[in-house]
Amino acid sequence: MNQSLLTPYGTAFERVEAGLTAIREGRGVLVVDDEDRENEGDIIFAAETLTSEQMALMIRECSGIVCLCLTDERVKQLELPMMVENNTSANETGFTVTIEAAKGVTTGVSAADRVTTIKTAIADGAVPADLNHPGHVFPLKANADGVLGRRGHTEATIDLMRLSGLKPYGVLCELTNIDGTMARLPEVIVFGKKFNMPVLTIEDLAAYRLAKESNTVTNTTEEVAVIA
């Protein structure tokens, strides 16, 4: 990845902070992974603040496979089985069965219907009966350790939500070019400028977490020493 393209966005720490600010403001964030992995840029929105307009943007500008990133706890709460028992995909992406809201939708495919499905799935009191299967929203189960356990967009999404102080559920979709090819970093940056979305990398987020959590452990150890 050509890191020099990200220089205008500041340091890795500053890029993550800009992303967190955008999430808290209800805006989207663009997250890019490594060249030796998917080498793709995803649009990410917080599930709890997601609007029909934002969903329409993802449907229009992205691959169309809109995914809802969930924690293992939420997947269990909704009793969502994994899509396959033996996951042989290269990156072991944690797809569960697809979902549709049991109430409040028509065909389930419109932007408004997909938002309804997502809001239903992340509601505090959500139960399995609130969802039908199959559907037009693709849930993804995140690694419990976030990007420190798996360098994926799914985990980056959950980490961003948690660090932003929001519910740990987010929506992502892979950004594509007009010709249907996957958007790489140069195209992602152009898109970000057009739609006022900050750009960061999964490695930025991993470094941010390591620094923050290491600092927390150090401070806690010092406090214990003082008390002792």
Swiss-Prot record:
One of its GO terms (molecular function) is 3,4-dihydroxy-2-butanone-4-phosphate synthase activity. It is an enzyme of class 4 (lyase). Mg(2+) 2 binds at E38, H153. Its EC number is 4.1.99.12. GO terms for cellular component: cytosol. InterPro entries: DHBP_synth_RibB-like_a/b_dom, DHBP_synthase_RibB. Signal peptide: none annotated. Pathway: Cofactor biosynthesis; riboflavin biosynthesis; 2-hydroxy-3-oxobutyl phosphate from D-ribulose 5-phosphate: step 1/1. Mg(2+) 1 binds at E38. Keywords: Lyase, Magnesium, Manganese, Metal-binding, Riboflavin biosynthesis. GO terms for biological process: riboflavin biosynthetic process. NCBIfam families: ribB. HAMAP family: RibB (MF_00180). Catalyzes the conversion of D-ribulose 5-phosphate to formate and 3,4-dihydroxy-2-butanone 4-phosphate. This is 3,4-dihydroxy-2-butanone 4-phosphate synthase. The lineage of its organism: Bacteria, Pseudomonadati, Pseudomonadota, Gammaproteobacteria, Vibrionales. The gene is ribB.
